[in-house]
A protein has these predicted regions:
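Sequence signature of WD/YWTD-type beta-propeller architectures
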Residues: 1-399
């Protein structure tokens, strides 16, 4: 409460912090530093998966929600409750805690959609798709979810700065109709000539962004493959797509590979990740964030945000003034969530690591933080009901 009062009294100004230590009965003073207090509030919760930074095997993992107004962390679902299976790709509709989805793999496999307390289990593999549905992105209306379908493989380097290569042999993009349990797509999104992945809707729901690269033989061409950032019109009333593809990032011209597009809720900015090649940037030390101003068409390299190590996954706050991203800047191994302010003019502040109550928390932790997502409130779910449906519920098959 004292901290909250101090912040409220300092909105629009700065807090000056002085540090003193007593060593050998003598007091020492460090140079003071300032903290700028912004009037734009941050969403109160952050959701992430915590998992050891392994490659093929896992044991413990879970999805957790952390209150950013204090240090309270609560379990959404821990895999010790579901026979130590894999769970991933949690996603929210417009930062709403009442409409979300996530996948479970291996045991109790399926996609789980939670809507206002209702839980639905889906079997998303169809004869027309490469795989079960993978990387998700909600339509702002909540009626649709865009997904990629991927034939993903993994290889290891004998000697390379990047330990692992994750790549697709094939991939497509589809749109799932939540109400009708149907999948729709278009030739530009599911072609044999290209590999499409990482979909994201515009804030008005009228455009679908995605990444695409010419199909090639993998893994032989893993260092040559580079993804363009593209978009196509989408009509939510007719469930139809446009005929023209717009290219926002041309990989051949730029010489790098784009992935993970995310549009700010106000529609002003599009953030994405670039690396020298490929589409799985979490293992690429050269991966950085980029920010496209949709109003001016200018791209910011975000030099004050990026580091010499991995910057990869990112997501927006509901007011478009904050973003959170995954980074391995601390030790090159563990992925941790960094939070950054973005002014209305597109100028970012200084990123800071998600605060913890114990100052040595990250030094002692043996877990990485995956897929950090802001939400506007606490997820309210009957965990026992979710586990029961996970283990014994019959999955709805898609059409």
């Amino acid at each position: 409460k004292k901290w909250r009062r101090l912040l409220d009294a300092s909105v629009g100004g700065n807090l000056t912090v002085g540090i003193y230590i007593c060593k050998d009965n003598r007091w020492f003073r460090y140079p003071p530093f300032s903290i700028q207090v912004i009037k734009d509030k941050i969403d109160p919760y952050l959701v992430y998966r915590r998992i050891a930074p392994g490659y093929r095997m896992w044991n413990r993992m879970g999805i957790y929600q952390r209150c950013l107004e204090d240090f309270t962390e609560e379990t959404f679902l821990d895999n010790k409750q579901t026979n130590n299976n894999c769970m991933n790709c949690h996603s929210f509709c417009m930062q709403s805690p009442d409409r979300m989805l996530f996948h479970q793999r291996a045991l109790h496999a399926g996609t789980y959609i939670l809507t206002d307390g209702d839980i639905e289990k889906l079997d998303t593999k169809t004869e027309r798709t490469i795989s079960a549905l993978v990387y998700p992105a909600w339509h702002p209306s909540g009626r649709y979810v865009a997904f990629s379908t991927n034939d993903t493989k993994q290889d290891f380097h004998l000697s390379d700065a990047n330990r692992v290569e994750v790549f697709d042999n094939r991939s497509d993009v589809v749109v799932y109709d939540v109400e009708k349990h149907e999948i729709v797509t278009a030739p530009h999104l599911s072609s044999e000539e290209n590999m499409e992945t990482f979909p994201a809707f515009s804030s008005d729901g009228r455009r679908l962004y995605f990444c695409s690269a010419p199909a090639c033989r993998m893994p032989e061409s893993y260092r040559k493959i580079r993804y363009n950032l593209q978009s196509i019109a989408f009509d939510p009333e007719k469930r139809s797509f446009g005929q023209t593809i717009d290219t926002l990032y041309n990989a051949n011209e730029e010489g790098r590979s784009a992935k993970l597009p995310r549009v700010s809720p106000d529609g002003r900015f599009l953030m994405y990740t670039v690396s020298d090649y490929g589409n799985f940037s979490i293992w690429h030390k050269d991966a950085d964030l980029r920010l496209l101003d949709m109003l001016t068409g200018k791209t910011d390299s975000l030099l004050q945000v990026n580091s010499n190590d991995v910057e990869s996954y990112h997501s927006w706050s509901s007011n478009s003034r904050w973003f959170v991203f995954s980074s391995r800047r601390d030790d090159g191994l563990y992925t941790r969530p960094y939070i950054c302010y973005l002014g209305a003019n597109g100028v970012p502040g200084k990123p800071f690591l998600l605060p913890q109550k114990e100052t040595d928390y990250y030094e002692r932790s043996l877990f990485s933080f995956n897929i950090p997502e802001f939400i506007r409130g606490k997820i309210k779910v009957d965990t026992y009901k979710l586990i029961d449906i996970s283990k014994y519920g019959e999955a709805v098959r898609l059409k």
